[in-house]
Amino acid sequence: MAVAEDSGMIHDIVQAYLSRLGEHHVPVWRVYLFGSYAKGTAHPDSDIDLAIFLDQDEIDGFREDVHLMRLRWGIDLRIEPHAFARSDFQDMDPYVREIVASGQRVF
């Protein structure tokens, strides 16, 4: 399965997931697709890595990750959500800087 053929499908999966987050009132501020799908190096078993910046200054990252993982059910289990607070984006630590620099903003 070629990645180029998957780009439209991945976009649809991400949009369906973002709709689900909206239905569950997740306070999404920004979302970036990162990792192999953003870099064009994905293979059929690749995760769909999403950095989800919540409109909150502080979060319990583990709790939010678990919540976001549950919401992927029925859409695509390859979705790998990574929760961040808005302040993580504003502080721009090296991990976040890499996500923003190499990722694709999808929301």
Each language-model region and where it sits:
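Catalytic core of pol beta-like nucleotidyltransferases
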Residues: 1-29, 39-44, 55-107
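P-loop (Walker A) phosphate-binding loop of NTP-binding proteins
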Residues: 36
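Conserved loop-to-beta-strand segment in the C-terminal subdomain of adenylate-forming
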Residues: 47
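Short beta-strand->loop micro-motif that forms the acidic, two-metal-ion catalytic signature
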Residues: 50-52
